[in-house]
Amino acid sequence: MLVASCSPRRIRPSDGGARRAALPNSVVNSKSICLHGGMAKFRPLLAEFIGTFALIFVGIGAMKTAGDNIVAVALAHGLTIAAFVSATLHISGGQLNPAVTFGLLCGGHITWPSAFRYWIAQLLGGIAAALICLSLFGRGVVIAGTPQLAINLTAAQGILVEGILTFFLVFVVHGTAVDPRGRGLAGFAIGATITLDILFGGPLTGAAMNPARVFGPAVAANFWHDHYVYWVGPFVGGALGGFVYRIFIERKPMTVTE
């Protein structure tokens, strides 16, 4: 079996066109194959970057346009997620959230190297969106658009709320975006879960359920108050969601994404 190399192959001028014609297609097209392979790894990362960018951009912008209208804010987040999960599901799995990626890792559906690449793309998307919002609306709006704990809520209570809300989200992700038995409902179901979680948890913690949703604005506005809550809670809840679905719901193991 001939295996094409990604390194260019030198052809002497005396070889002429006949020499080129005699080369196997696998060698002639090796550069195209390598380029295609590189793009195949880049496309999911670009999809995650764009989807996460959209979520943070709309999320912060909703605070500028809707203010304290929790229904409008919840719908803005939920509809954005529904649209971009649907748009990226066939490209990257429509994760758009480091906690969801961690849940899929715990559920056995993604490898550690892939998870790290996805985390970088998601966090960069969040930072880029927050920086643009900073230039458009100013630091005050970015801070107002960053999920925060209610005055009467402790950090431990915030972690518990974020963990439970993220558990719901990751469980739904496994049941729709991952499990082929429910994949047709993924965008709607995940968007609806985000909307419902924000309607309940928005007044308590801001219902981030997504470290990138907090990390991007924190970097842009240099606002780190109770920041760890929005990593610990979602990652614990995401891990539990992945483990529970894998152990108790799945009928048979599913393919791991490289």
Provide a role label for each language-model segment:
Residues 6-12, 24-258:
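Membrane-interface helix-loop junctions and terminal tails of multi-pass membrane proteins
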Residues 16, 21-23:
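Short, low-complexity intrinsically disordered segments enriched in A/P/G/S/L with frequent Arg
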